[in-house]
Amino acid sequence: MKQYTIKTIDHEVYQLNSTTDNEQLTINTAHPKWHVVNKAACSAENRLIKINESGRWTSLKDYNGVYDSNPTQPTKPVEVQLQKLDDLDIDDSLFESMQTGTVVDKFLSTEGGFLPGTNINIAGSPGVGKTTVLLELLSQLHTQGKRALFISAEMNQIDMARYLKRFPRWGQIPMLFLGDYCDHNPKAALESVLEQGWDLVLTDSFTEVNDTVKEESNMSRSKTEKWFLDLMSKHNLGSNKLKKHTTFMTILQLSKGGTFVGSNKLSHMATAMMYIKWEGNENSNRRYMEFVKNRVGQVNKKLYFNLREGINFDEARYTRDLLNDELVAEERKQLE
């Protein structure tokens, strides 16, 4: 039995590399086992091709991390430096929030608005309005002079142009359409544009960015994810031309089971995790946003909105719900 890793040459050609020797196999659409290799290559997880003694081809999950393994290198002593928070040189701009001028500011953080150098993941069902509501918030900050960027890996220029009549403010937001670079090093394109320095970046979506870079750069899924998370962390810290402590809003896709697509590292490394959901039946026009994790603000508070003639946040309901929560909390204290 032999096992092979899969390397994508282009959309119709794959290269199989033996895990035990230097053997390489080229598989194109004319190969009788094309469908086996193509299905494995398009899987959401890293898979290996196994060829047994009888000549049968199957695929299996990379349980042993073959794709991520590297030749063993001599280990060097690690020099560890401990730090004290009092000794850190903290940029005061990290505490200057970016406010949209809407009730969303109260919803986002206790300071009000987006905080520099933070990462917010947003998940929700298709069609619930994730991109629409987040782009509108982005446009409000752009109008105020903030450097705002939209990275679109799902929609092209024509898709976005259809929104202009309803949301004219979107017309001046700088946008990177990653599909334009599918065959021209999308990894370098992303690194280059982020190096310019931005206050706030909206990415739609993490999965599509990951898949685009993974395919063109021949990286494993886990390595691509690590690269993108490291890239965000770099710009959180202000390592760009303008020394901007970039805040990232990243849209995540949902699986059929209702969980976000990606590793748990996505959730653990995020400052906040938000869901945008329907209330009641799908397409009922009753939608709400809710944080299930938020290091800089409240969780489990619902902010309702609708998309009738633009985006309308139900500030009265949000304020009323907060007041009710305070009254309930006060009553519980008195009973204790």
Placement of each model-derived feature along the sequence:
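Short, mixed-charge low-complexity intrinsically disordered segments
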Residues: 34-71
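Conserved inter-motif catalytic segment of the P-loop NTP-binding fold
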Residues: 144-230, 320
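The Walker A/P-loop phosphate-binding site
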Residues: 67-167
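Phosphate-binding/switch region of NTP-binding enzymes
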Residues: 237-336
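A short beta-strand micro-motif
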Residues: 3-9
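A short, exposed loop/beta-hairpin motif centered on an aromatic-Gly-Thr core
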Residues: 12-24, 29
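Structural motif
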Residues: 121, 200-204, 249
